[in-house]
C-alpha cells in the first residue's frame, strides 16, 4: 500500500491514504474474501447485534466471540454506539427515533427520497461511546423501475487488512436484508473511505494475501419469507460456497 507513514492512538505506524473509493457489485455474488479465512459467524453476530440495538457484549461471549472485548467496560457495556444510534437515536424532546425502520418505510412509500440515511455519528454522545463509529453513515438509493437497491457507506477510518473485510461483508448483508424487506434486488455497495490505512505489522501478511489466487465467488441465501427487518434471525442467513 502506498501512502505516507503516520502515527495514531495505537502507537503503531500505519501507511495511510485519504479519500479511497470502493465499489462492489452484488447482483451475481456476495463479497467475502476467499484469500484468507474470514470469521463469518462474528460478522453475522455483530450485524444482528446492531439490528437489535444492543450495546452490551454478552451475546458475543455466549457465542465465544471476542471482537469487542478490547473496548467494553468491566460490565461489558460500550455506550451508545452503532445499534443504539441506528434503532433509538435520542430526540429533542426525549423520544427515540428508529432510523433504520424509517428508511425501510420510506423506500416502500417514497423510493426516490434523498433522505434514506442512517447515521451513527451523534456528536452529543461521542464522549459516552467506548469507541466512536468508524462506519459513520450509510445512504440507500432505490431504483423503482429496475427494483434495485444500492447502499453507499461513509467510513471515516478503515483498517484495510482486518476491519474493512468485516465492514464490507456486514454492509453487503445489511443491503441484502433491507432489499428483501422492500421487494428489491441488491445492486451496488459503495464505500467512501476517509483514512484508509494499513498497519506496519500487517504488511507482510497483506503481501502474502495479494499473492494468493481467489477461490470461486460466493452466493448468499436468505429466508425468502421474511419481510420485516426485526423478523430476521441469524439462522435465516446461508453463505453458499465458503
Regions found by a protein language model. Name each.
Residues 1-242:
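Terminal, non-catalytic protein-protein interaction segments that mediate quaternary/complex assembly
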